[in-house]
Every structure is written in C-alpha cells, then in structure tokens.
Amino acid sequence: MTQLLKLTRRGLYCDAGDFYVDPWTPVERAVVTHAHADHARPGHQKYLAAKEGEHIFRLRLGAEPEFDFVEFGEMRNLNGVNVSLHPAGHMTGSAQVRIERRGEVCVVSGDYKLQSDPTTRSFEPIRCNIFVTESTFGLPIFRWETSESVFGEINAWWSANAAIGKPTVLYGYSVGKAQRLLAGVDPHIGPIFGHGAIVNACAAYRACGVDLPDIQSVQSATSNHDWSGALIVAPPSAHGTAWIRRFD
C-alpha cells in the first residue's frame, strides 16, 4: 500500500509507529475512527480516539480500557510518526486518521459522509499523498436524496399516521443512525419513544454535547399505554419480535 501502512491479518498496520487503525483482533495500540462495533472492538491494550465521542466510546467499550482521547487536529507522536484525527462526518466522534512520517502523509478515512448532519462535525478534506477510503456505498448506482427530502417524507408520514390515531415505527441502529433520525424529525408532531438501547445511546450523545429531542423508554410505559400518534424508534433486531408487536 505505502511504506506507512500495510494490510495484515489484524488490519491496517503502521510498522514505523507500531499501531493499527481499526484492527479486527486485539492489539497493543489501536487508533479507532469511531464507536461503531465493527470499528471499535474490545480487547486492545491502548486506544487513541476523538474526544468528541468519548462518552459513546465508553458506552461501547466500558470504563476499563486505556484511552487517549484527543481533540480534532491535536497531534500525537507515536514512535516518530505524527498522528492526528480530523472530522469524518459519519457520527459523533467519527474521525479520519492523518498519519505523517518524513514528509509522506497518508489519511485513512474510516466511515464518512459528505451531507450535513446536526449530530456530527462536517467532513474535513485533508491534503495527503495517499487517501485510504471506505467504500461500502462507493458504486455509482448509489444515489442519495437530500436530508431535507428524506425527513420531509418521514415527518409527513408520521403526521398522517398521527391524524388517524396510529403509531409510527422507524428502525435505526442504536448508536448513530437512531440519533440521526431523532435529530431530523419534528418533535412537535407527537411523543417519541425508543428501545432501551437507543435511549441509553441518546444519553451518551447528549453527554457529548449533541442536542436531541426528548425520548422516553418504551419499557417505562404501562402495559395498556395508548401509542396513538407516537413515534417509536427501534433497532432493526426488534423487527418481528414480541417487543415490536405491542404497537400493532
């Protein structure tokens, strides 16, 4: 790939700095781009991550791991290699990793997006020699509508359901996507409820300084609660379960 990075069975490795970026298996030092489970894995001895996402990392990995939380743009020297983190726009605390040694600069994007998002800082372009990009949706067949269009449709659907006394259910991953949904909907339409995992993640987001509408735990409601007009946000894993059937 470059002299700075190589792909190993544990993931991207910087030999000169002796650290990995989002490694797949436990290592001594991991630079982690964001707190989603496929990137922030447990078992590493030391973690370097963006301070903006500290509370989300702690929710994901607990209080025990040794973390070095850094501000965006703050430099760390790891065995002669300069490392800094820069906004990736994917979720709160998501970062690109800038790696520099002897004039060569490599940037590992991690997951990122270019659309504006009130739950995270916007993607920051960084000048570099090598850009290692995430490309899950890199094919040209993927064309995304604007956030304004998507949330306009969601709010209109929720309003229509509320008008006939029906609840509305949205699925979103507990950490990241659920909070993005909550930040975009109109909370004046009706009450908002969430799965316990989502409510806990929202608390971590608020601790990181993200403004989200009030959300009540579904578990806190009585067994005969009237869900008319409510918005319920649930993880995809709840689909088809007894938990979700209470809203039928």
Each model region followed by its residue ranges:
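Short, surface-exposed amphipathic charged segments that create phosphate/polyanion-binding patches used
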Residues: V81-P87, Y205-L212, I232
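Short acidic-hydrophobic, aromatic-tinged amphipathic segments that line or gate anion-handling sites
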Residues: F67-E71, M75-N77, L212-S223
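C-terminal regulatory/interaction regions
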Residues: P187, S217-D248
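His/Asp/Glu-rich metal-coordinating catalytic cores
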Residues: T2-C14, Y20-T25, R29, A35-V169, ...
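A short acidic (Asp/Glu
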Residues: Q179-G184, A204-Y205, I244
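Conserved helicase motor "Helicase C" RecA-like lobe of SF1/SF2 P-loop NTPases
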Residues: L181-G196
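Structural motif
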Residues: W24, E52, G172-Y173, H195-A197, ...
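Long, charge-dense
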Residues: F193-P213
